[in-house]
Amino acid sequence: MSCRSLSKEELARVFSVVLTEQPDEVNLSVHDVVAMGRMPYTGFFGNLGKDDEAMVERALRLTGMSAFASRGISTLSDGERQKVMIARAIAQHTPVMLLDEPTAFLDYESKKTTMAMLHAIATDMDKLVVVSTHDIDIALRHADRFVTIGGDGLRDLAKADVERMTGAMG
């Protein structure tokens, strides 16, 4: 089946997306932002049922953000906001998560923690987690497969191939 044949609603049940740019949801709590991930199942008005609420709570717990649930999103650090956006993607409950530079604004320890969390999500929840990054060191520590984009198009590489390439670059 081609993605082109899917409606927006169907796409939202297959792909969850975390972008580099984080929206300023000034008047929303962390819980409300994560609950937005349930929109493909609850509709525009977002009336959460018991199962939806359980998915939101699970996503908050998995990302370590449960204690922040009632806080306003605008009061959080960049790293905390990134965890909220990842929690929203988890709550969306899709088989594929796409993340654009999820460690872009994070310190080194937070980068490692975030990538380890994403790897655990892929493994424990049987999801395809696709991360775009320029941080080869972090990717080498946590990724199972690599796809590079260059003048010759897409290349699917094993970890050893990437290590050889980066070793040759110095």
Language-model regions, residue ranges each:
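H-loop (His-switch) and adjacent beta-strand-loop-beta switch element
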Residues: F146-A160
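ABC ATPase NBD Q-loop/coupling interface
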Residues: M1-E10
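H-loop/switch region of ABC-family ATPase nucleotide-binding domains
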Residues: T133-H134
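Catalytic Walker B motif of ABC-type/P-loop ATPase nucleotide-binding domains
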Residues: M97-D100
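Helical segment within the ABC ATPase nucleotide-binding domain
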Residues: K112-D124
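Conserved ABC ATPase "signature" region
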Residues: A35, K50-F68
